[in-house]
Amino acid sequence: FLPFIAGMAAKFLPKIFCAISKKC
């Protein structure tokens, strides 16, 4: 369960950070 959460976070957090900071 935790590895799945970590995998999803690793996949989506960069996109969210990119959208917020406008640095892609």
UniProtKB/Swiss-Prot annotation:
Mind listing the UniProt keywords for this protein, alphabetically?
A: Amphibian defense peptide, Antibiotic, Antimicrobial, Disulfide bond, Secreted
Task: Identify the tissues in which this protein is expressed.
Answer: Expressed by the skin glands.
Instruction: Please indicate which superkingdom the organism of origin belongs to.
Output: Eukaryota
UniProt entry tagged with the keyword Secreted: yes
The text of the family note is: Belongs to the frog skin active peptide (FSAP) family. Brevinin subfamily.
Q: What task does this protein carry out?
A: Antibacterial activity against Gram-positive bacterium S.aureus.
**Protein name (record):** Brevinin-1Ba
Q: Which organism is it from?
A: Lithobates berlandieri (Rio Grande leopard frog)
What does the organism's lineage look like at the top?
Eukaryota, Metazoa, Chordata, Craniata, Vertebrata
